[in-house]
A protein has these predicted regions:
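Short alpha-helix boundary/capping motifs
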Residues: 7, 58, 84-85
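Short proline/glycine- and acidic-rich turn/helix-capping motifs at secondary-structure junctions
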Residues: 8-21
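Active-site-adjacent substrate-binding region
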Residues: 18-69
Length: 113
């Protein structure tokens, strides 16, 4: 009824969800880093999003992968997308604190067995 007569949509493909054990070193590292920063973390058994994470987490590769980050932003890939550069609220990380969070994550990753 509506739209363009010369456009045809073919649905196909797709990929499995990204699933990682909460006992993996990667997830333990993420949780430890958030705890050190005093940030509350939420674990989701599956990651949604626009990346084929199962390419890495499913056989035959089977390595953990996940999303990590501190700081605040919203509106990803939209005209009103933003990321907080400098925060006046000590409970909300800006760019510098987010960068330090990544550095701490890498140190934690090296330390956690």
């Amino acid at each position: 009824k509506h739209g363009f007569a010369d456009v045809e949509i073919k649905v196909g493909g797709g990929y499995d969800p990204t699933e990682v054990s909460e006992d993996s070193r990667l997830i333990k590292t993420m949780l430890a880093t958030y705890a050190r920063a005093g940030a509350k973390a939420t674990l989701n058994p599956r990651l949604a999003g626009s990346w084929p994470g199962a390419t890495f987490t499913a056989p035959p590769v089977s390595i953990p992968a996940g999303h990590f980050g501190m700081g605040h932003g919203s509106g990803a890939h939209a005209p009103d997308e933003y990321y907080l550069i400098e925060s006046t609220n000590p409970k909300v990380a800006g760019l510098v604190d987010a960068t330090m969070g990544y550095a701490d994550f890498l140190y934690q990753l090296a330390a956690i067995k």
